[in-house]
Amino acid sequence: DKIVIVTHVSPDGDALGSSLGLLHFLETQEKNVHIIVPNAFPDFLRWMPGAKDIIRYDKYSEFADELIAEADVICCLDFNALSRIDAMAKPVAASAGRKVLIDHHLNPEDFCRVTISHPEISSTSELIFRLICRMGNFEDITREGAECLYTGMMTDTGGFTYNSNSREIYFIISELLSKGIDKDEIYRKVFNTYSEDRLRLMG
């Protein structure tokens, strides 16, 4: 299967964490996977495993259009409306590939064959973890994938300072730690990098 993962304009930690976490899992299933994003993402997320292979639509639109057109499956992560992927909306809508929405925002639009929407869950990265486990594939989550999923969960809750009171989140963190992630190092890479992007995220 040829699988394309797309996420929203100006991708944040959860957009990239969920996309890369899903990519690392799908690669263990021997799938051909590409991530396409509409535009640039912050420098403080470039360390994430697999980030260097992400395709920017604003730079490589012709190549991206080919991948989207030829995809068997298009996974739409961390957005609830086609307008959120900017210029990519038209080729994604036109593709014959089966579209799957996986998101945690309210009121998803009806543009995918399958919609997995859980606004009660704090991040799309957490949702990806839950889906992989629901399929019985926890063993196939790699350390690299776990690092990406943890980053998404951490950034979408402000370092677990809001929207993070469910016990399940901390159970999931313990499961990700069992994969060998260093959560303190991940925190330093994301929150102690004082770039312009970082300062903007801090408010």
Regions found by a protein language model. Give the residues of each.
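Glycine-rich, phosphate-binding/catalytic loops in enzymes
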Residues: L22-L23, P91-A94, S117-H118, F171
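Short glycine/serine/threonine-rich phosphate/pyrophosphate-binding segments
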Residues: G13-S19, L82-D86
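Hydrophobic helix-and-loop "lid/oligomerization" segment in the mid-to-C-terminal part
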Residues: D1-V9, G17-P49, D53-R56, E62-E66, ...
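Short alpha-helices
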Residues: I102-I172
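Acidic active-site catalytic centers that drive phospho-/nucleotidyl reactions
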Residues: D12-D14, D78, D103, D156
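Short, glycine- and charge-enriched coil/turn segments that flank and shape catalytic ligand pockets
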Residues: E30-N32, D65-L67, S95, M135-D140
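Short acidic, glycine/serine/threonine-rich loops at helix termini
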Residues: G17, R46-P49, M88, F111-V114, ...
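Active-site cofactor/cluster-binding pocket
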Residues: I55-V114
